[in-house]
Regions:
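Bacterial N-terminal signal peptides that target proteins for export
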Residues: 2-11
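C-terminal motif of bacterial Sec signal peptides marking the signal peptidase cleavage site
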Residues: 19-21
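Sec-dependent N-terminal signal peptides
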Residues: 11-17
Length: 168
């Protein structure tokens, strides 16, 4: 009878140990952080804020930082030429083309008559610009803003431009 009692006690001890072992709290698995891209909106960039002259074309480089979903180029420009009496005239003779070109388009433009543009305002002397630009994801993108005196007449044109790149 003693053998049965000892055997029973062993079984009870075994069951109690197993039961308490199952109820022991498990260590929490460590949370692995999910890779997230922090979206920080860069400050506005003044692409051009000045008055300058153009014979053939004048270029301004701009770079859209990576991870910008809604870049925008906005502002205005006016063009002038000097008339026969030396007076400043703002008329159709002062017209220029404003082109926004990516790197490949700009390369085509300077090495021949490039036809493709990202954005353009053509044959104008007084223009308000509000262009949505392509989003950037993992890499920044470079663009070229080109004021083009396509007709070449008059030979020199004066441009007063105020254009800003923002990242709403």
């Amino acid at each position: 009878m003693l053998g049965r009692s000892a055997n029973k006690s062993l079984w009870i001890a075994f069951i109690l140990l197993a039961f308490t072992g199952c109820n022991r709290s498990q260590p929490k698995p460590e949370d692995t952080p999910t890779a997230m891209v922090q979206s920080v909106i860069p400050p506005e960039q003044h692409v051009v804020q000045k008055t300058f002259s153009v014979q053939k074309y004048q270029t301004f480089e701009l770079t859209i930082p990576e991870h910008c979903l809604h870049p925008r180029l906005h502002g205005d420009f006016k063009t002038f030429h000097y008339g026969e009496q030396g007076n400043r005239a703002n008329d159709d003779a002062a017209n220029v083309d404003l082109l926004l070109l990516d790197e490949q388009q700009f390369n085509d433009f300077i090495h021949g008559p490039g036809e493709e543009t990202t954005r353009s305002a053509q044959n104008t002397h007084d223009q308000v610009i509000d262009w949505a630009l392509p989003a950037t994801f993992g890499n920044p993108r470079k663009f070229f803003l080109v004021f083009n005196n396509a007709t070449g007449k008059p030979k020199i044109k004066i441009i007063d431009a105020n254009l800003t790149l923002s990242f709403d």
